[in-house]
Regions:
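Conserved AAA+ ATPase core "coupling" helix
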Residues: 148-153, 398-405
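Conserved AAA+ ATPase "SRH/arginine-finger" region at the nucleotide-binding site
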Residues: 141-144, 389-398
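Short regulatory helix/loop adjacent to the ATP-binding pocket of P-loop NTPases
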Residues: 130-135, 371-385
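A short beta-strand-to-loop transition that corresponds to the Sensor-1 phosphate-sensing loop
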Residues: 125, 364-368, 395-397
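Accessory regions of macromolecular translocation/handling assemblies
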Residues: 1-37, 75-81, 85-105, 109-110, ...
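P-loop NTPase motor domains
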Residues: 10-11, 22-75, 81, 124-138, ...
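Walker A/P-loop NTP-binding active-site region of P-loop NTPases
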Residues: 99-151
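Conserved beta-strand edge residues that scaffold enzyme active sites
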Residues: 19, 126, 146, 368-369
Length: 454
């Protein structure tokens, strides 16, 4: 009963040891014994909630069907609809394995495509491959070596840059596209190898020389350039190698010969060696409104390769979100990013900026305890507080107090998902709350394929 009152925005004052006064209040011959203490003006919305059969679910004007609530009313959601309590279209999906997260995610992706948005997803289990092919999308298995994202092709991290955003990575504070990308590359190379500051500064100097060699400056019109117009990692390696072979101590360079040698040794595998098949090449991903990056094989790769590849994919997503716009980036199994705290910072700052271009991010994960650890707890909290649209399934065996604190749940809200209910979740939409039973129309279910989430 208390849960229903809370959902109807009716606050409850518990009258302990006041039965006699309560009886007088409701008795035909009694009087209002609590009037002076508890009487207040009742809002019209609360009065309306007292009427029977007043509930109509959620019916956004341009919304798409995602299921029914516990009363049987339809839930139609338009994620782009802004309100005082919904300032972006970012989405969060959390829950234990087997509760229906993948099913909901596939339904939301199809709805977003139907609404006219482009979608880029990171598929950790290759669950979306059949659906991608069914709707004419592009499935790119990054470990197969067929598709490539050129690391040295400048990507946008912020359309204007805010030098005062001291809590953001350096790439978000630069004002020009080339400066943003060089700042990103410094973090990228750190993710690949444990380079010192001196190594990174040397690489930065070499990058500046490389872009000048290819005629790329701050004033370059990048919209007119083709993927093949940009340098690739082997070009960077050749430039550094030339600097090393022709090093002249009498010129008093900012970097030493030994530094160049160590940088060459650290970058050899990525530029010329075994890892070059994943990084060294021009971007050749087909233009598609639905692009799925298959990263299943990446999860078993070496940690440095995995971190660098995830960083590279994140840069591609950010560029589409902030330059093309009207795009949704979906990151499934968010926990795989936790091995790289810098990547978490980039995701957090993307969440804050994508709304400017009518874009959004969809984050999904299961083991919430992975995010509640020393060293990453403060970085991951915004990932759960920024999205105004949250779909919370049963979390399994987890500490109740920390779960409620991290997701800012009330006791009554937690009780709704305390026990496993396959396909049922708590849908938090700004200040609105719905106990949602996820249902997809039959014609959309046929597109889901035979993998997870069917």
């Amino acid at each position: 009963m208390l849960t229903e009152l809370v959902r109807s925005k009716l606050n409850v004052d518990r009258l302990l040891l006041r039965q006699q006064q309560g009886f007088r209040c409701v008795s035909p011959s009694g009087h209002n014994a609590f009037g002076t203490q508890f009487a207040r003006v009742l809002p019209a919305s609360s009065v309306a909630n007292l009427y029977p059969f007043n509930y109509s679910g959620k019916l956004d004007g341009k919304g798409f069907y995602i299921g029914k609530d516990k009363y049987g009313s339809n839930i139609l959601v338009d994620f782009d609809q802004r309100d005082e309590d919904k300032t972006s279209a970012n989405i969060l999906i959390l829950g234990n394995s087997g509760q229906g997260k993948s099913y909901l995610m596939k339904l939301l992706i199809l709805n977003l495509l139907e609404s006219g948005k482009s979608v880029i997803t990171l598929d950790a289990e290759h669950e979306q491959q059949e659906m991608c092919e069914a709707v004419g999308g592009c499935f790119a298995d990054l470990m197969a070596g067929q598709y490539m994202i050129n690391v040295l092709e400048p990507k946008c991290w912020d359309d204007c840059g805010d030098p005062n955003a001291t809590d953001a990575p350096e790439a978000f504070r630069k004002s020009t596209l080339l400066a943003q990308h060089i700042s990103f590359l410094k973090d990228f190379f750190r993710a690949y190898k444990d380079f010192s500051d001196a190594h990174i500064d040397t690489i930065e100097i070499m990058l500046s020389k490389l872009y000048q060699k290819f005629g790329i400056t701050e004033r370059t019109n990048f919209s007119r350039m083709r993927p093949t117009d940009y340098p690739i990692l082997s070009d960077l390696y050749d430039l550094i190698e030339e600097e090393y072979k022709t090093y002249d101590t009498s010129r008093h360079q900012l970097y030493t010969e030994k530094l160049l040698q160590e940088v060459l040794l650290g970058l050899h595998s990525m530029c010329k060696g075994a890892d070059a098949q994943f990084f060294n090449g021009h971007t050749n991903i087909t233009s598609s409104r639905f692009l799925v990056f298959g990263v299943k094989g990446m999860l078993s790769a070496a940690k440095n390769v995995r971190n660098a590849m995830l960083f590279n994919v994140l840069s591609f997503m950010s560029d589409k979100l902030l330059t093309v716009g009207n795009t949704v980036a979906a990151l499934d199994e968010l926990y795989i990013w936790l091995s790289n705290p810098t990547a978490i910072e980039y995701i957090r700052n993307c969440l804050k900026r994508v709304r400017k271009k009518e874009s959004a991010m969809l984050l999904a994960s299961q083991n919430l305890e992975d995010f509640d650890q020393e060293g990453i707890r403060e970085m991951t909290k915004p990932l759960f507080s920024i999205p105004p649209h949250q779909f919370l399934f049963n979390a399994g065996s987890i500490d109740k107090r920390s779960y409620m604190e991290m997701l800012q749940l009330e006791e009554s809200e937690y009780k709704l998902i305390k026990f496993p209910q396959r396909g049922a979740c708590l849908y938090k939409c700004g200040n609105e709350r719905y106990l949602l039973e996820v249902h997809a129309p039959a014609y959309k279910e046929k597109l889901f394929g035979t993998a997870g989430g069917r």
